[in-house]
Curated annotation (Swiss-Prot):
Organism taxonomic ancestry: Bacteria, Pseudomonadati, Thermodesulfobacteriota, Desulfuromonadia, Desulfuromonadales
Pathway: Cofactor biosynthesis; (R)-pantothenate biosynthesis; (R)-pantoate from 3-methyl-2-oxobutanoate: step 1/2
GO CC annotations, alphabetized: cytoplasm
Species this protein is from: Pelobacter propionicus (strain DSM 2379 / NBRC 103807 / OttBd1)
Main location: cytoplasm
GO BP annotations, alphabetical order: pantothenate biosynthetic process
Active site: E186
Gene: panB
EC number assigned by the record: 2.1.2.11
Protein name: 3-methyl-2-oxobutanoate hydroxymethyltransferase
Length: 269
């Protein structure tokens, strides 16, 4: 599909909200998965700092570095996806100063090949988003459950219940006013996500935020059943590939040990 459809752009994403067409976003951290995800027809590919957990085996995203994000973004960009390519800005790459944030976001575009960056935070990061968008780098916001703030939040907990709801609505409005072209809503009640989506003119993309967002994002490894250690409530598994892969490796091991592989078919004369 990636060779037949036209390139998705930032204006296309904005137009999708206006036309009430649902936006689809999926993670990819490397070249092979980028090709597969793009062939599936998603509108946006996210090189998420979730790679720290999913790809590298850490307990959270806080150890992911700029160099790691650039490396993975370059790998995904080589797939030349028709989907718009968005990359997470990792922890401490944009919090220190506006100047450093702009420089690092510029690196992600220039060195990584991203077409947009994602920045976590609401009112507290609106000045950073405003500065980055002012130098023509598209920014996707991210509010609610922000994984880079897990220590303050006390872990991966649903946000926006009771008195928190008003603050998260204010965060959403601040991110929009700062110039973001879209915003991820993570781990918030579906009723709050619906209210934010109705209030904003920019698209909302939900993950654990219910069905009323303008779009949805999930981690590719989660939907394929490759992350066996955990399965959040908001994840739907569309395949169970872990046992398929394990079985293939087991059969390879057995055939090598028994002498059944390689055969003449797999040998050179």
């Amino acid at each position: 599909m990636s060779d037949m459809r036209k390139k998705v752009t930032i204006p296309d994403i904005l137009k999708m909200k206006q036309e009430r067409r649902r936006i689809t976003m999926m993670t990819a951290y490397d070249y092979p998965f980028a090709r597969l995800v793009d062939s599936g027809g998603v509108d946006a590919i996210l090189v998420g700092d979730s790679l720290g957990v999913v790809f590298s085996g850490h307990d959270n995203t806080l150890s992911v570095t700029m160099d790691e994000m650039i490396y993975h973004t370059r790998a995904v960009a080589r797939a030349k996806p028709q989907a718009v390519l968005v990359t997470d800005m990792p922890f401490m790459s944009y919090q220190v100063s506006v100047e450093e944030a702009c420089r690092n976001c510029g690196r992600m575009i220039q060195e990584g090949g991203a077409q947009a960056v994602k920045i976590e935070g609401g009112m507290n990061m609106s000045h950073v988003i405003r500065a980055v968008t002012s130098i023509d780098i598209p920014v996707m916001g991210h509010i609610g459950l922000t994984p880079q703030s897990i220590h303050r939040m006390g872990g991966y907990r649903v946000q926006g219940r009771k008195e928190q709801a008003e603050r998260i609505m204010e965060d959403a409005l601040a991110v929009q006013a700062a110039g973001a072209f879209s915003i991820v809503l993570e781990g918030i009640p579906s009723s709050l996500a619906a209210s934010i989506t109705a209030e904003l003119s920019i698209p909302t993309i939900g993950i654990g935020a219910g069905p009323d967002c303008d779009g949805q994002v999930l981690v590719i490894h989660d939907i394929l059943g490759l992350c066996e250690k955990y399965s959040p409530k908001f994840v739907k598994r569309y395949a169970e590939l872990a046992p398929v892969i394990t079985d293939a490796v087991n059969r390879y091991v057995e055939e090598v040990r028994s002498g059944a592989f390689p055969t003449e078919e797999h040998s050179f004369n």
